Amino acid sequence: MTASAELRGDELIAKRHLPADPERVWTAFTSPASIAAFWGGSHATVPPESVTVDLRPGGEFALDTRAPDGATRRLRFVYVSITAPHELVFDEPVTGLRTTVTVRPAVDGADLTVHQRRLPPELRIAQAADGLGSILDALATHLQHHEATPEWRTP
């Protein structure tokens, strides 16, 4: 199974079934090492040392993405609300983009929805949908190849 992603005006909605329980999915979205492992999807890499996470409303997380040509881009987000292990909302201050990550228990894992609102015009393109889909597919691969360990547990 692969991710599905759909553009609707200034919104992008991507969905993916994941082979892990909601707590592991949550930790993947909030752990610097896991974020580095999947965030670049098929189109970029994320140097692990570039990822910072301050998991609280008003806290930031940031990371660098490195394209195949070596171009690096710093991404910065601010957490709006945190409801572990089911919902994470964060904004990208530069573009005004708001992302809501929802994790629901499902048979054999969890169902993940990533809903981005207020997409700027330059991101309302098929390439953005494909990119988000590839990130969710990379997350699924990461979860399949990494066993649950104590650090997967939320506090």
Predicted regions and their residues:
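A short, structured loop/turn motif at beta-sheet edges
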Residues: 22-23, 56, 80-85, 102-111
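Glycine-centered tight beta-turn/hairpin loop motif at sheet-sheet or coil-to-beta transitions
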Residues: 9, 70, 94-96
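Hydrophobic ligand-binding cavity/cleft-lining segments
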Residues: 1-45
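Short beta-edge strand/loop motif at the mouth of beta-sheet-based domains
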Residues: 13-14, 33-72, 151-155
